[in-house]
């Protein structure tokens, strides 16, 4: 054997790895199309978010939220607190309701940097990070920032809506108990006791409890804690709730503290008896929207005193569908036949400590439907219907975080439309979602936005107006701190609600 020849290796290296392709062709009705994938482009699907990010920066909302977060890491390899909370912010804004959806944010090469983040963390990092937050400290942290959002508005007359909503669960989660669940009877759930600022659709607080703790007695502690925290001078002009809240402990405490209330009553036997008696009388007054009203004073079983009760009725002029559930496996449907000399009425009963006329009371309670719309939006368009973990602590932390980010976005979209507050299903496609490419030249960063929305001209005009306002705020309010700038932003966003008045920030301490 010639020693100059190289020795043959007894173990060949095998096949060389194939080169990954980044282009393809597709035959379409318009002809052949060449498709290429660019994995390094500075693009984002949320191209109109920079204006929202400046809004957060000017008001100090995001910086304060990150700085106050009671989360500490001991490992040098752990993610930054700003990266973790920024990932939660982007996920909730995008309408996600599962931790797994966070992976879709990894394609965004623009907005994380604009938020001061170094990267988008993984879904597992978010789960582990939230697990490290002490529950009591975490809930206090979130409640502090919820209070910061609404505190400037509490000096105005306002209505406090109290209600609860059910979140069905499908696993072995902590607190997954069987309780009141109208849509999925028998399904374990969590109960969200919620306190809202009516008309503005702002969440003041949320308390996540096991599914069998849905009654008012489980939400009373949170209610009176909220009222104690905001101070007597800023209490609501009215406390409003549905049939579950019209009970003796809530009403007697409100009467003791001088807080006006308006609740719906259950149609108990005594209420029906009073209604039957009133039906024979003719002096029913107009209650608006086809309703008629008549008032009386009742002392129902369990009540400590007589109270003013308003009985409402409305004639039904539409076909009625009856459901016979004698055989649950096969319910029977039939249409009710109403004769020419017969009338069908819909009834309701309200209990109140207000002295207002019946027409005003009827409208005040109908306005509570806005609270139901907010629940629907939070559960179906935001994250209250998801982000479920085995422990109750992280469910509570995410519920508070979603409520906070919901408040931030709700107030921001009012800057875009001073007369309306569209829901997320409308505002996200118009004001958030658009393809944007970032370029840099001569030290200047440019974001080129391509919106596919049919009314993109409205978004452009709205953002030009918002950009002008924020520019004026930067130029004329350089000496203002974030709290004072937040008051200026709220005064602009809620100009119609405040009737053009400026909110007065608290005086700053003079320097010594």
For the regions a language model picked out, list residue spans one by one.
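An anionic, glycine-rich sequence signature occurring as long contiguous blocks
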Residues: 3-4, 20-35, 260-374, 380, ...
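Short amphipathic alpha-helical "interface-anchor" segments enriched in bulky aromatics
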Residues: 102, 358-401, 405-412
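Acidic/histidine-rich, metal-coordinating catalytic segments
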Residues: 236-246
């Amino acid at each position: 054997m010639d020693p100059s020849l190289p020795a043959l290796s007894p173990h060949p290296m095998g096949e060389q790895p194939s080169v990954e392709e980044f282009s393809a062709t597709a035959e379409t009705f318009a002809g052949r199309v060449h498709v290429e994938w660019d994995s390094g482009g500075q693009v984002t699907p949320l191209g109109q978010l920079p204006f929202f990010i400046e809004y957060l920066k000017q008001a100090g909302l995001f910086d304060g939220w990150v700085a106050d977060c009671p989360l500490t890491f001991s490992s040098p390899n752990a993610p930054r607190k700003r990266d973790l909370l920024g990932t939660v912010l982007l996920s909730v804004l995008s309408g996600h309701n599962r931790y797994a959806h966070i992976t879709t944010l990894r394609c965004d090469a623009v907005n994380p940097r604009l938020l001061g983040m170094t990267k988008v963390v993984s879904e597992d990092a978010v789960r582990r990070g939230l697990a490290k937050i002490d529950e009591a400290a975490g809930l206090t942290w979130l409640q502090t920032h919820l209070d910061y959002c609404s505190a400037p508005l509490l000096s105005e007359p306002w209505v406090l809506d109290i209600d609860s909503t059910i979140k069905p669960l499908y696993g072995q989660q902590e607190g997954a108990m069987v309780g009141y669940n109208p849509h999925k009877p028998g399904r374990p759930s969590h109960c969200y006791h919620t306190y809202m600022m009516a008309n503005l659709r702002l969440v003041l607080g949320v308390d996540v409890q096991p599914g069998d703790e849905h009654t008012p007695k489980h939400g009373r502690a949170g209610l009176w804690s909220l009222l104690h925290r905001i101070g007597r001078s800023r209490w609501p002009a009215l406390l409003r709730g549905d049939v579950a809240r019209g009970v003796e402990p809530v009403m007697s405490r409100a009467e003791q503290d001088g807080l006006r209330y308006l609740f719906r009553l259950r149609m108990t036997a005594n209420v029906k008896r009073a209604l039957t008696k009133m039906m024979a009388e003719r002096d029913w007054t107009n209650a608006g929207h086809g309703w008629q009203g008549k008032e009386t004073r009742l002392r129902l079983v369990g009540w400590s005193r007589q109270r003013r009760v308003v009985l409402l009725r409305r004639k039904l002029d539409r076909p009625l569908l009856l459901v016979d559930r004698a055989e649950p496996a096969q319910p029977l449907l039939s249409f009710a036949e109403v004769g020419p000399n017969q009338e069908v009425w819909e009834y309701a009963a309200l209990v109140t400590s207000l002295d207002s006329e019946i027409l005003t009371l009827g409208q005040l309670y109908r306005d509570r439907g806005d609270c139901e719309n907010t629940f629907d939006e939070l559960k179906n368009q935001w994250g209250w219907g998801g982000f479920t973990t085995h422990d109750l602590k992280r469910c509570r932390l995410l519920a508070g975080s979603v409520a906070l980010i919901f408040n931030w976005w709700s107030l921001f979209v009012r800057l875009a439309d001073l007369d309306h507050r569209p829901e997320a299903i409308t505002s996200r496609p118009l004001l958030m979602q658009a393809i944007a490419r970032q370029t840099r030249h001569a030290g200047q960063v440019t974001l080129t936005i391509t919106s596919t929305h049919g009314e993109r001209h409205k978004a452009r005009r709205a953002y030009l107006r918002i950009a002008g306002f924020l520019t004026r705020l930067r130029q004329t309010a350089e000496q203002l701190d974030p709290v004072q700038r937040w008051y200026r932003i709220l005064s602009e966003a809620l100009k119609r609600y405040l009737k053009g008045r400026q909110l007065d920030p608290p005086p700053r301490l003079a320097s010594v």
